[in-house]
């Protein structure tokens, strides 16, 4: 397992298309640096799990390097779906301020299983601890079933 953490994003990304694109390019460069020495041909199954802007990077990286993989999209942003070409599953909170639910539903329609959490934010949290723990458990079960 390789974890890619992103650093150095500009302030004020949310709602600013130019800064969002800048953050995406920075993150993609960091992912390419971290993953650059991996010989992907050595692996039968590859799973990328992305969150937020990481979902855009995961899809773009897979597309750029022509990787066949399973893509888990946790709270994807709209730009993510420009790069998803293979097997994917998505999880979105209906109160996510970073992505409109209608846009996510439309982007997933007919091609990507989408699981909505009513009232959840960009962290799939609602503020109800019991509900959030149940959501986390259901999400993990769905991810496990998806990647098997």
Locations of the language-model features?
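Short, proline-enriched alpha-helix->beta-strand connector loops that line the catalytic pocket
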Residues: 83-88, 110-112
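Catalytic histidine-centered segment of alpha/beta-hydrolase-like enzymes
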Residues: 120-135
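Gly/Ala-rich beta-loop-alpha elbow adjacent to hydrolase catalytic centers
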Residues: 49-58
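Serine-hydrolase catalytic machinery in alpha/beta-hydrolase-like enzymes
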Residues: 1-43
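A conserved short beta-strand
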Residues: 66-78, 86-87
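Short beta-strand/loop motif that positions the catalytic acidic residue
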Residues: 90-92, 96
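Active-site signature of alpha/beta-hydrolase-fold catalytic machinery across serine-
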Residues: 60, 64
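Conserved alpha/beta-hydrolase "acid-adjacent" motif
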Residues: 82, 97-103
